[in-house]
Amino acid sequence: MVKVNGFSFVARSAGIRKSGKPDLGLIFSTVPARCAGVFTTNKVQAAPVLVTAPRIAAGECQAVLVNSGNANACTGEVGMQDALRCGQLAAKSLGIDEQLVAVSSTGVIGHPLPMPLLEKTIPGMSEGLSETAVDDVANAMMTTDSFAKVASRQAGDSAPYTILGVAKGAGMIHPNMATMLSFVMTDACVDQHFLQQALRQAVEGSFNIITVDRDTSTNDMVLVLANGESKTPEIVADSAEGQEFAELLRGVLLDLAKMIVRDGEGATKLVHVCVNGAADDGDARKVAYNVATSNLVKTAFFGEDANWGRIIAAVGYSEAQVDPSRIAIFFDGVPVVQKGLGTGPELEAQATDVLKQAEFSVTIDLGLGDGRGEYYTSDLTYEYVKINADYRT
């Protein structure tokens, strides 16, 4: 079990979820931690986002309280007061300033939090804090997720520290984040401004290159807390240590991001869409985005149909610079298109075998330049429709 110096965790069932499963998680640092955050781009933002964003912007955080089963979104002033009250209850239990508590929620939109249940449960949570209970918090965050999502990285021997992250998400997953929460804890000592910079870059190369269903939630947030309890020297920008930290942080977030796509509601495939040879990186990303989000492409993945026509059509409407006569498409290295033309039934049959795998790559070479881009996506299945048709019942 991975531990991070100075961090402890606890989860409880407050009764928000009908199933009776844990629905309330608490992350605590023994000392105030430097922090950074990235939040939903949705213009309709849930109360916990509105409460937490300015607290994170202040630069210090000591605890994160998260509930599942209720988003506390579109709940008006009552929702704001409820979010504030939850933070107050956690702060009092922990003996810290309420401004150091981040609050987060995920679940059904439009219903007020069941405050009597939370008033009863939150005050006693601090008594159960444990250095090894991170999996419990990851489980308490889940809604339609089928498994808990935890990832970690450790720095080298010269100045050792640990980065540990948890996440939830399976539906409403789309670039610029979606119904997706992630909390990252590290005992490294990191300059606060660099921490925000490193987080934004890591999110750009992880959570912002995944898609399940093109929906973006009201509640997304990614937070990182760095408490310095490893007692290693401060990590700053433009240094070898800073580069290592940024790479490790992205590694944790990318692991979590791929778990989210793998757990996409009803998903049976994890597909890595890679675009090479674009005029520039922006064009490459446009192409990867359009292929990864095409419902026709995603249903072909589910049907294990190497239907490259749907892919090349998505390339064509991406608004990227394209010369059809230069396009090549590969499934795990099997060429199905060369110079804009199909390579024939034998290679297409090999590509169909590739699509029977749970994970594979689709590589598109535009043959125009050095631009590169990527996305991770899932297939689109009957089960996705069923899960979301029944979500509130």
From Swiss-Prot:
Molecular functions per Gene Ontology: glutamate N-acetyltransferase activity; L-glutamate N-acetyltransferase activity
InterPro entries cross-referenced by the UniProt entry: Arg_biosynth_ArgJ, ArgJ-like_dom_sf, ArgJ_beta_C
Leader sequence residues: none
Pathway the protein contributes to: Amino-acid biosynthesis; L-arginine biosynthesis; L-ornithine and N-acetyl-L-glutamate from L-glutamate and N(2)-acetyl-L-ornithine (cyclic): step 1/1; Amino-acid biosynthesis; L-arginine biosynthesis; N(2)-acetyl-L-ornithine from L-glutamate: step 1/4
Entry annotated with the keyword Flavoprotein: no
Main localization category: cytoplasm
Site, Involved in the stabilization of negative charge on the oxyanion by the formation of the oxyanion hole: residue positions: 106-107
KW Amino-acid biosynthesis (keyword) present: yes
Catalytic activity field: N(2)-acetyl-L-ornithine + L-glutamate = N-acetyl-L-glutamate + L-ornithine; L-glutamate + acetyl-CoA = N-acetyl-L-glutamate + CoA + H(+)
Function field: Catalyzes two activities which are involved in the cyclic version of arginine biosynthesis: the synthesis of N-acetylglutamate from glutamate and acetyl-CoA as the acetyl donor, and of ornithine by transacetylation between N(2)-acetylornithine and glutamate.
Assembly and interaction partners: Heterotetramer of two alpha and two beta chains.
PANTHER family linked: ARGININE BIOSYNTHESIS BIFUNCTIONAL PROTEIN ARGJ, ARGININE BIOSYNTHESIS BIFUNCTIONAL PROTEIN ARGJ, MITOCHONDRIAL
Name of the protein in question: Arginine biosynthesis bifunctional protein ArgJ
Organism of provenance: Syntrophotalea carbinolica (strain DSM 2380 / NBRC 103641 / GraBd1) (Pelobacter carbinolicus)
